[in-house]
Amino acid sequence: SPPLAFTFGLGGLVLFPMSVGASIVLLEQAAPPALLEAIPAYGVTTLITAPTSYRVMAETARKMHLSVAQGGTLRQCVSAGEVLPAATRALWKDATGIEIIDGIGATEMLHIFISHPDDDARPGATGKVVPGYRACVMDDAGRPLPPGVVGKLAVKGPTGCRYLEDARQAQYVKDGWNYTGDAYLIDADGYFHYQARTDDMIVSAGYNIGAPEVEEAL
């Protein structure tokens, strides 16, 4: 369902399917009801949409028996575009038996650079660095932070960009690192955990607290 103008849509609905000779189902109106109808109608095996859609579709999907294990065709479900709450991941898996594959990319990077296979999902984590890319969490001075400390996500890889005229983006690339504008922490096993946008952080008693963390607690 992502627009083709987004990196998520360009990769998920054009480049990746074409690279393996897969057929693509493009819907003019890709709202959750239309997505659910399209899966059995076209024998869809991989569903690509945002976390909000998975949450909205879960209860109806439970009755439709869409997954291969339930007698349907659906084998994989991919999510990006916004943070994937652990509750949404669990809700969809309970309804379909399928673990959502999460990931984060950026239009400037033209690729998802942190993700995980479906058998290596960790609730609350986006995943690990995709082969070919490097990622770390930096402090305000551009120094790598240790595991468990929230900082700015910085990425290097075979794709990237530079801004030429927009003064607001003059700090996007520093020392070859692309700063995505996301606040993350890395756990001891190398999994990246999204916290918030870097302009959406709450600082309390010297700690950086992500707004989504507060929302989940409430």
Where does each model-flagged region fall?
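Alpha-helix capping/helix-boundary segments
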Residues: 31, 52-54, 84
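Active-site glycine-centered loops adjacent to acidic/histidine catalytic or metal-binding residues
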Residues: 81, 105, 127, 142, ...
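Conserved AMP-binding/adenylation subdomain of ANL enzymes
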Residues: 4-46, 60
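Gly/Ser/Thr-rich phosphate-binding loop
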Residues: 19-22, 41-49, 58-122, 134
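Conserved ATP/PPi-binding loop(s) of AMP-dependent carboxylate-activating enzymes
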Residues: 128-132, 143-175, 207-209
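AMP-binding/adenylate-forming catalytic core of the ANL superfamily
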Residues: 47, 154-157, 162, 169, ...
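Hydrophobic alpha-helical segments, especially N-terminal targeting/anchoring helices
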Residues: 138-139, 180, 186
